[in-house]
Amino acid sequence: MRLVFAGTPEPALPSLQRLIDSDRHEVIAVMTRPDAVAGRRGRPSPSPVAQLAAAHGIPVLKPARPNSGEFVAELSALSPDCCAVVAYGALLGDALLAVPAHGWVNLHFSVLPAWRGAAPVQAALAAGDEVTGATTFQIERSLDSGPVYGVVTETIRPTDTAGDLLERLSVSGAGLLEATMDGIEDGTLTAVPQPPEGVSVAPKVTVDDARIRWELPAHVVDRRVRSVTPNPGAWTMIGDQRIKVGPVTVAGDGPKGLEPGEIRVDKKHIHVGTGSDAVLLGTVQPPGKKPMNAADWARGARLDENGWAR
């Protein structure tokens, strides 16, 4: 089939590469978000998807208004059979959805109807799910509610961060997306409506959402920190500094009797109290510095062992 691929960030790259390498499909164009300012230099930079497409000589479309009549006409002129979407980053209107004969097929990183929305991987980790996955489905106007073509599942490991889990899902999901395109082309695949039961939502994670709530039980703090690692990154205030915090370890044999947010420092460890057991900090990142071992930072900062994280 003649395909247009719509995507923007790194997790979309395995899917794009898989379709480029396919001997059954031709990626005739890539649709991605406009160049965004990135890095300290503040210069606009093409998205990862745009860079990969350009490396393969594939035309790159960067509409500022993808639902405008002008862009709908531009896409229609390409006569795509189907459009594949992985983390494009904008909602698509009816006129755009009507362009390809086989519609738009989205790869979503959850087992729908669970975790519809912008942050399904983060939501699954924060909730303590043991299994998640990826789903291909036909895009409709309502968010992530279209009929499903296929699903792959992935076991969530006890130490998974959002980055770890998304990396695995982006690879397994790429195979699912290619298989879905194959099935649509040869007519062997039919989309099945999502069940009305089991719907949950996963809105975009904000910086405020990533602030550690030390009053929560230790196992919940652990999950929530991993769910926002590496982005936007868990954080807390220690003194007057906002400190980013890497994954923590529940310390059942750690200091007892610490209040939520109370810090206990020794030569090799920093423990922080929660609503249950203490947790052991692994890495921290002070403002303007690189991540470092938490105990090393505490020594250099002369952190008061009776300090508080809040």
Curated annotation (Swiss-Prot):
EC number: 2.1.2.9
GO CC annotations, alphabetized: cytosol
InterPro entries cross-referenced by the UniProt entry: Fmt, Formyl_trans_C, Formyl_transf_N, Formyl_transf_N_sf, Formyl_transferase-like_C_sf, Met-tRNA-FMT_C, Met-tRNA-FMT_N
CDD domains given in the database record: FMT_core_Met-tRNA-FMT_N, Met_tRNA_FMT_C
Family per record: Belongs to the Fmt family.
Native source organism of the sequence: Mycolicibacterium vanbaalenii (strain DSM 7251 / JCM 13017 / BCRC 16820 / KCTC 9966 / NRRL B-24157 / PYR-1) (Mycobacterium vanbaalenii)
Function: Attaches a formyl group to the free amino group of methionyl-tRNA(fMet). The formyl group appears to play a dual role in the initiator identity of N-formylmethionyl-tRNA by promoting its recognition by IF2 and preventing the misappropriation of this tRNA by the elongation apparatus.
Keyword line: Protein biosynthesis, Transferase
Name of the molecule in the record: Methionyl-tRNA formyltransferase
Signal peptide: none
Pfam families: Formyl_trans_C, Formyl_trans_N
GO molecular function: methionyl-tRNA formyltransferase activity
Entry binding sites for (6S)-5,6,7,8-tetrahydrofolate: 110-113
Catalytic activity: L-methionyl-tRNA(fMet) + (6R)-10-formyltetrahydrofolate = N-formyl-L-methionyl-tRNA(fMet) + (6S)-5,6,7,8-tetrahydrofolate + H(+)
